Protein backbone atom coordinates (compact mmCIF):
# COMPACT_ATOMS: atom_id res chain seq x y z
CA UNK A 1 0.00 0.00 0.00
CA UNK A 2 1.46 3.39 -0.97
CA UNK A 3 2.20 5.84 1.85
CA UNK A 4 -0.33 8.37 0.56
CA UNK A 5 -3.16 5.90 1.15
CA UNK A 6 -1.82 5.16 4.62
CA UNK A 7 -1.82 8.89 5.45
CA UNK A 8 -5.37 9.35 4.21
CA UNK A 9 -6.61 6.32 6.14
CA UNK A 10 -4.79 7.61 9.22
CA UNK A 11 -6.52 11.00 8.82
CA UNK A 12 -9.89 9.25 8.57
CA UNK A 13 -9.13 7.15 11.65
CA UNK A 14 -8.04 10.18 13.66
CA UNK A 15 -11.22 12.02 12.68
CA UNK A 16 -13.27 9.00 13.69
CA UNK A 17 -11.49 8.81 17.04
CA UNK A 18 -12.08 12.54 17.54
CA UNK A 19 -15.76 11.99 16.79
CA UNK A 20 -15.91 9.31 19.47
CA UNK A 21 -13.99 11.35 22.05
CA UNK A 22 -15.71 14.72 21.51
CA UNK A 23 -19.23 13.47 20.95
CA UNK A 24 -20.76 15.66 23.68
CA UNK A 25 -20.13 18.95 21.82
CA UNK A 26 -21.89 19.54 18.53
CA UNK A 27 -19.22 21.83 17.04
CA UNK A 28 -16.41 19.33 17.66
CA UNK A 29 -18.52 16.52 16.23
CA UNK A 30 -19.23 18.54 13.09
CA UNK A 31 -15.54 19.35 12.61
CA UNK A 32 -14.57 15.70 12.98
CA UNK A 33 -17.31 14.69 10.56
CA UNK A 34 -16.00 17.20 8.02
CA UNK A 35 -12.50 15.77 8.45
CA UNK A 36 -13.85 12.31 7.74
CA UNK A 37 -15.65 13.49 4.63
CA UNK A 38 -12.58 15.36 3.38
CA UNK A 39 -10.35 12.32 3.82
CA UNK A 40 -12.90 10.15 1.98
CA UNK A 41 -13.00 12.73 -0.82
CA UNK A 42 -9.21 12.74 -1.16
CA UNK A 43 -9.07 8.94 -1.02
CA UNK A 44 -11.75 8.60 -3.71
CA UNK A 45 -10.05 11.15 -5.93
CA UNK A 46 -6.61 9.57 -5.68
CA UNK A 47 -8.00 6.10 -6.29
CA UNK A 48 -9.93 7.28 -9.35
CA UNK A 49 -6.84 8.99 -10.76
CA UNK A 50 -4.47 6.11 -10.06
CA UNK A 51 -6.74 3.38 -11.43
CA UNK A 52 -7.75 5.42 -14.53
CA UNK A 53 -11.33 4.38 -13.85
CA UNK A 54 -13.39 7.03 -15.64
CA UNK A 55 -16.75 5.96 -14.24
CA UNK A 56 -15.51 6.54 -10.70
CA UNK A 57 -14.51 10.17 -11.29
CA UNK A 58 -18.04 11.39 -10.49
CA UNK A 59 -18.10 9.72 -7.04
CA UNK A 60 -15.89 12.28 -5.21
CA UNK A 61 -17.99 15.15 -6.52
CA UNK A 62 -21.20 13.51 -5.33
CA UNK A 63 -19.55 12.92 -1.95
CA UNK A 64 -18.54 16.58 -1.80
CA UNK A 65 -22.14 17.64 -2.54
CA UNK A 66 -23.44 15.48 0.30
CA UNK A 67 -20.73 16.84 2.61
CA UNK A 68 -21.79 20.41 1.80
CA UNK A 69 -25.44 19.59 2.50
CA UNK A 70 -24.47 17.91 5.76
CA UNK A 71 -22.41 20.93 6.79
CA UNK A 72 -25.27 23.33 6.06
CA UNK A 73 -27.77 21.29 8.07
CA UNK A 74 -25.27 20.81 10.89
CA UNK A 75 -24.44 24.50 11.11
CA UNK A 76 -28.09 25.50 11.10
CA UNK A 77 -28.75 23.01 13.89
CA UNK A 78 -25.76 24.38 15.80
CA UNK A 79 -27.06 27.94 15.47
CA UNK A 80 -30.53 26.89 16.59
CA UNK A 81 -29.22 25.02 19.64
CA UNK A 82 -26.79 27.77 20.64
CA UNK A 83 -29.45 30.48 20.29
CA UNK A 84 -31.96 28.48 22.30
CA UNK A 85 -29.76 27.12 25.09
CA UNK A 86 -26.47 29.03 24.87
CA UNK A 87 -24.45 25.80 24.75
CA UNK A 88 -23.58 23.35 21.99
CA UNK A 89 -24.12 20.13 23.90
CA UNK A 90 -25.56 17.24 21.92
CA UNK A 91 -27.83 16.35 24.85
CA UNK A 92 -29.79 19.56 24.16
CA UNK A 93 -30.90 18.12 20.82
CA UNK A 94 -33.33 15.82 22.63
CA UNK A 95 -35.06 18.90 24.07
CA UNK A 96 -35.79 20.30 20.58
CA UNK A 97 -38.33 17.59 19.75
CA UNK A 98 -41.87 18.76 19.09
Swiss-Prot record:
Protein keywords: Electron transport, Membrane, Mitochondrion, Mitochondrion inner membrane, NAD, Respiratory chain, Translocase, Transmembrane, Transmembrane helix, Transport, Ubiquinone
**Which family does the similarity line name?**
Belongs to the complex I subunit 4L family.
| Pfam families, A to Z | Oxidored_q2
User: Which top class of enzyme applies to this chain?
Assistant: translocase
Topology in the membrane? Multi-pass membrane protein
Q: What is the lineage of its organism?
A: Eukaryota, Metazoa, Chordata, Craniata, Vertebrata
- Supply the source organism for this entry: Orycteropus afer (Aardvark)
State its role: Core subunit of the mitochondrial membrane respiratory chain NADH dehydrogenase (Complex I) which catalyzes electron transfer from NADH through the respiratory chain, using ubiquinone as an electron acceptor. Part of the enzyme membrane arm which is embedded in the lipid bilayer and involved in proton translocation.
The residue ranges crossing the membrane are: 1-21, 29-49, 61-81
Q: Where in the cell is it found?
A: Mitochondrion inner membrane
Please provide one cellular component term from the Gene Ontology annotations of this protein.
Answer: mitochondrial inner membrane
Indicate yes or no for the key word NAD: yes
Q: Name one GO molecular function term.
A: NADH dehydrogenase (ubiquinone) activity
Name-wise, this protein is NADH-ubiquinone oxidoreductase chain 4L
Instruction: Report which superkingdom the organism of origin falls in.
Output: Eukaryota
Q: Name one GO biological process term.
A: ATP synthesis coupled electron transport
Amino acid sequence: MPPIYMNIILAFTLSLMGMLVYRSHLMSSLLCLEGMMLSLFILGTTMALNMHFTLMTMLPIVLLVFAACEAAVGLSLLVMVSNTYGLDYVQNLNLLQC
